[in-house]
Amino acid sequence: MKALCLVAHPDDCVIFALSYIHHHPELSWTIGYLTYTDSDPRGAEMAAFWQRRGINTVFLGFEDHWQDDEQKQFTRWRSEPAEAACWNLAQHYDVILTHDADGDYGHIHHQLVHRAVARHYHVVTFAPHNQGTVTLTVPPGTYTLDELPMHGDIIRSFHIDQHRNSYKEPQ
């Protein structure tokens, strides 16, 4: 089965999705990003991280601008084309792993990605710790933050002691 992890920003897939991806190797994964391109330094670093694990990446290329989340409105682009781009990518996959409806912690880009794919028949969402239907841990040594120097500080801030995530799976 084909699975898509569709997230807003390059670091989101490691912060929120790596546990699920690691525990579901039977799925043929692709990582999709709302923001950045594979030629941006952050995009290139994350694409290389997933390439080393045999996972392809797709970047939709929308600009990631801090003012969007601060002002709770899109300042550089309209939401409709972004939602359409997310859906156009997602509709070709059997399983979608993505942000929850609240945008995990209220981030406007995360909320947009969720809205765009919520109608898919098999959506797994990130959940607050221990509030999902399943909680998974990434075994130590699966990755190191040395692989992701541009993203390490933010990833470390979410996973201080161990890399553990909760998810809500369709019932």
Question: Could you tell me what each predicted segment is?
Answer:
Residues 2-122:
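Active-site beta-strand->loop->alpha-helix modules in alpha/beta enzyme cores, enriched
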Residues 1-2, 171:
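Short, Lys/Arg-enriched, disordered terminal segments
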Residues 49, 87-91, 95, 122-171:
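The feature marks non-catalytic terminal segments
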